[in-house]
Swiss-Prot record:
Recorded superkingdom: Bacteria
Biological process terms in GO annotation: amino acid biosynthetic process; aromatic amino acid family biosynthetic process; chorismate biosynthetic process
HAMAP family listed in its UniProt record: EPSP_synth
Disulfide bonds: none
Residues where phosphoenolpyruvate binds: K20, G92, R120, Q168, R343, R385
NCBIfam families linked: aroA
Originating organism: Enterococcus faecalis (strain ATCC 700802 / V583)
GO cellular component: cytoplasm
UniProt protein name: 3-phosphoshikimate 1-carboxyvinyltransferase
Family note: Belongs to the EPSP synthase family.
GO function term, MF aspect, one: 3-phosphoshikimate 1-carboxyvinyltransferase activity
A Pfam family per the record: EPSP_synthase
Catalyzed reactions per annotation: 3-phosphoshikimate + phosphoenolpyruvate = 5-O-(1-carboxyvinyl)-3-phosphoshikimate + phosphate
Amino acid sequence: MQLRTNVKHLQGTLMVPSDKSISHRSIMFGAISSGKTTITNFLRGEDCLSTLAAFRSLGVNIEDDGTTITVEGRGFAGLKKAKNTIDVGNSGTTIRLMLGILAGCPFETRLAGDASIAKRPMNRVMLPLNQMGAECQGVQQTEFPPISIRGTQNLQPIDYTMPVASAQVKSAILFAALQAEGTSVVVEKEKTRDHTEEMIRQFGGTLEVDGKKIMLTGPQQLTGQNVVVPGDISSAAFFLVAGLVVPDSEILLKNVGLNQTRTGILDVIKNMGGSVTILNEDEANHSGDLLVKTSQLTATEIGGAIIPRLIDELPIIALLATQATGTTIIRDAEELKVKETNRIDAVAKELTILGADITPTDDGLIIHGPTSLHGGRVTSYGDHRIGMMLQIAALLVKEGTVELDKAEAVSVSYPAFFDDLERLSC
């Protein structure tokens, strides 16, 4: 696909896609609760549709009228054995969180996905679930999908210190803990996104959070709720960066989720001197509008506790750093290696093709800026965030064309991405 290049400026207002993390979890919580859950602004991207289809295969009635999703909750005990292997597509969230839910279901389930999922490590989830009494293993005797899990109605609580900072692993353990008899304790390596904890409370459950320690006493029964999904800051990030680096730009992004465990990119932009203003903030629902304007940027260092708060935004932050004055260092981000692709290597290789001065390290990137970008042939590696990052990079190319292979990957989280960009472009 030939990407849009040499854009003079970007102007306009956008409603970015609904939050992917909350959309996944709204289906899951609706399914394991008693009664009806309605979901407004559900993200109909490929990943979240994989979650929806997965729970239908477990016997959950889910209706979609095009505006609202309605989930007829069955409770944990009402989930039924799937007739076939559950296909999670490209969704790591689906497979890892479902393992936690299935840990308490007394039947065997197989989960598989695409070629990318087949490379995603699962021991980080399987080990604690097996400690709780589930029988979970790779079908091919490795830690990689396909995965087979046989749950048990006698799950034991766990006291677990996380070896990696992963909201997916934490969430899987918490879903299992909701079904276990007794108090489970999870200690995080670093604070990660807390949508699961928030939604446990929203659906009538209880847990205690003390810094990085989470304590949950089970078993618990949840009750269906009405969920309104805000815009996804991870999708908004591409237009935040575009607005900062394309000359004479001003973009208003409406109703973006502003959960503090997800807003690390806003802190980085502020540290780099970028102009992003929060308007119409709704603190109760963790959302607001974001107004971004073209800015002069300076380099920064990114590492430590902030990394889990912006892990998915690091590819587009790397592009931002190519336009900042000085040397930006990203460290402590080794988790990027086990995303849809090795995002450290992918970002470095593809931006280098376009003229960036960027070096991969074992746990991050070193980026010298500012640099002018030029045309070239690049690939998304089938990774939606790499694909969208490269289109924003192409906006800055004044000479030559940019050809993107595997552009269709963006539909995983943002099916209308190219159309939305076209509406802003001048």
